[in-house]
């Protein structure tokens, strides 16, 4: 449809796995096999519960026959109804139903336990896997896709597994059991009942096939409407600024009308299934009643057996319906399991070397030696990068967006490995260190601040959980954060909400800087560290950073070139290559790429 936005998170009404057979094998082999004894207990009690329930109508039919014979006998001058015998039958029936209920409870308890244990294991496996995946994986996947696996897919697998396995067992047992009971009562009446079943399912299949496309449209348009609501809510200020309220309402109404049409048709067709089943059920009921009456008049069958057969006949269709519904549920469950296993089978980050180099005693000399790198093999973005950095130097990396500045820092910390060449720290290839120890050498302040829900103190201590309160306060003072923290309610113990919306963007940046200061790293990385802070705060930060960077190798990535004038070396990057290098004054004298960048920013500042 022209102009239609792509659905956010829309999925078909019934999902199908690409390879359901293989996914089922993995689910059994890697997870369900560990619960084989619980599943066996569940199977035994599920079958037992179903069997006791199935026998009920037959026993109730015996009571009906006894009452009928008693009434007929009374009329003909006999003894009448034997109530003690009827009571015995009813007590037996009550006992069977009580046992069936108990068995059902054990079966439900056991299956729920298995499903929740499976959910627990899967969540743990996914959580562990996330920390093993290379950064390249997260470049290919959105946060929403990963969150959907952790939440929606695992929940769907757990819930559907709990319901589906139980329903499959009970439905199959019920169908077989009822069929056996019907055959023991009357083969002729059973054949009459079975003739109606395929006819009813043929009609229902046509209705389901017709309604399915409308369910698909309903899901799609629901996703469009939800997406519009989300966009309109998050961007309502912009909508009002540009006077787009009417246009937004028109667009919403268009999709909402389509949702109404598809939802109405799908629900209407879906609602036809019960009347159709009811109609054919009544037809079967009439046929069985007429035939049963005839057979009873001939003395071939008892009245109680007719009553039992009618009850079995009405119960027979229900488990068949359940199995048809379960098949769709199983498809969705296996599709969810397939996505989970696909995630768990992703390649892990390359393992650390066994004979790793210790970081003890390293001072921070860094060398980039003919480094080539691309996020994909066919698109190299860093070409033959060479640079030598002495310990304690302040190195600024500048260049236009997409020049490869941030990528160089990611390579330095081994978020990615180079395609060719080497990155050395004090003469050792970064691949020769354990990743954990290598990254502990660095302190990083990112452009996008990240704080978790918790106290300000805990956020500052994130990189050094055993830090004392005095150390936390000293770090906050060095980052010029102590003053504003003390003005907040509860000071260092104030809780930051989930989105850190109760403090300003500049305050967030100050806290992340304090967090880095507390870890006392050997190598410092500032990625746009002051880009979102006001001028006064930036001056305070710059002063604190200058003190922090003394004696430490420091890499600064910034678009605002005024913040890196005092750098020992400025590397100017463009399209993955270093095209200029030198101090601020030397690069201005060259009147090259850097000078043009600096002058353009200076002119913008003047304007």
Feature-to-residue mapping (PLM):
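ABC-type nucleotide-binding domain
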Residues: 79, 352-353, 359-607
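Alpha-helical segments in transporter systems
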Residues: 29, 37-62, 93, 108-112, ...
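Short intracellular "coupling" helices and adjacent cytoplasmic loop segments at the cytosolic face
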Residues: 4, 9-16, 116, 124-148, ...
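An intracellular "coupling" helix at the cytosolic face of ABC transporter transmembrane type-1 domains
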Residues: 29, 33-36, 135-136, 154-161, ...
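Transmembrane helices of ABC transporter permease
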Residues: 34, 38-51, 62, 93-96, ...
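Cytosolic ends of transmembrane helices, especially the final helix of ABC transmembrane type-1 domains
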Residues: 221, 244, 268, 285, ...
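Membrane-integrated ABC transporters
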Residues: 1-53, 68-89, 107-111, 115, ...
């Amino acid at each position: 449809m022209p102009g239609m936005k792509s659905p956010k998170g829309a999925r078909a009404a019934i999902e199908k796995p690409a390879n359901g057979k293989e996914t089922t094998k993995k689910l059994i082999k890697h997870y369900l096999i560990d619960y084989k004894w619980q599943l066996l207990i569940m199977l035994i009690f599920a079958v037992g519960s179903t069997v006791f329930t199935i026998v009920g109508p037959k026993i109730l039919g015996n009571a009906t026959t006894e009452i009928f014979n008693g009434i007929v006998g009374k009329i003909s001058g006999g003894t009448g109804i034997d109530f003690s015998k009827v009571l015995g039958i009813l007590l037996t029936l009550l006992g069977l139903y009580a046992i069936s209920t108990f068995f059902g409870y054990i079966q439900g308890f056991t299956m729920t336990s298995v499903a929740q244990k499976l959910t627990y294991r899967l969540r743990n496996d996914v959580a562990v896997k996330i920390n093993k995946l290379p950064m390249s994986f997260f470049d290919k996947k959105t946060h929403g896709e990963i969150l959907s696996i952790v939440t929606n897919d695992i929940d769907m697998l757990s819930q559907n597994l709990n319901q589906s396995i139980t329903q499959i067992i009970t439905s199959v047992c019920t169908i077989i059991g009822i069929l056996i009971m019907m055959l023991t009562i009357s083969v002729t009446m059973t054949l009459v009942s079975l003739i109606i079943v395929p006819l009813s399912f043929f009609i229902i299949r046509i209705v389901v096939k017709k309604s399915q496309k409308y369910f698909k449209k309903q899901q799609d348009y629901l996703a469009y409407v939800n997406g519009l609501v989300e966009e309109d809510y998050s961007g309502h200020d912009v909508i009002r600024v540009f006077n787009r309220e009417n246009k937004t309402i028109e667009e919403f109404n268009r999709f909402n009308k389509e949702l109404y049409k598809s939802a109405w048709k799908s629900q209407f067709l879906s609602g036809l299934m019960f009347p159709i089943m009811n109609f054919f059920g009544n037809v079967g009921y009439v046929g069985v009643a007429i035939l049963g009456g005839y057979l009873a008049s001939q003395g071939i069958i008892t009245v109680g057996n007719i009553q039992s057969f009618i009850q079995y006949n009405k119960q027979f269709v229900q488990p068949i319906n359940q199995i048809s519904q379960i098949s769709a549920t199983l498809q969705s469950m296996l599709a969810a399991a397939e996505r989970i296993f696909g995630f768990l089978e992703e390649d892990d980050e390359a393992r650390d070397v066994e004979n790793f180099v210790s970081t003890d005693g390293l001072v921070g000399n860094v060398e980039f030696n003919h480094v080539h790198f691309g996020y994909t093999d066919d698109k190299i973005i860093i070409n033959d990068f060479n640079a030598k950095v002495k310990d304690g130097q302040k190195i600024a990396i500048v260049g236009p967006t997409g020049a490869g500045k941030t990528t160089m820092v990611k390579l330095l910390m081994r978020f990615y490995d180079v395609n060719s060449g080497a990155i050395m720290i004090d003469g050792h290839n970064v691949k020769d260190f354990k990743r954990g120890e290598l990254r502990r050498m660095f302190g990083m302040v990112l452009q996008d601040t990240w704080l978790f829900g918790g106290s300000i103190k805990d956020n500052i201590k994130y990189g050094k959980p055993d830090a004392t309160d005095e150390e936390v306060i000293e770090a906050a003072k060095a980052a010029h954060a102590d003053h504003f923290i003390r003005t907040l309610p509860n000071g260092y113990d104030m809780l930051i909400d989930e989105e850190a919306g109760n403090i300003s963007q500049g305050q967030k940046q100050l806290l992340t800087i304090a967090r880095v200061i507390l870890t006392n790293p050997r190598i410092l990385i500032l990625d746009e560290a002051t880009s979102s802070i006001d001028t006064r705060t930036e001056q305070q930060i710059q002063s604190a950073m200058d003190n922090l960077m003394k004696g430490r190798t420091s890499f600064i990535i910034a678009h605002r070139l005024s913040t890196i004038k005092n750098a020992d070396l400025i590397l100017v990057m463009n399209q993955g290559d270093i095209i200029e290098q030198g101090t601020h004054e030397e690069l201005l004298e060259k009147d090259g790429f850097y000078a043009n960048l600096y002058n353009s920013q200076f002119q913008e500042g003047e304007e």
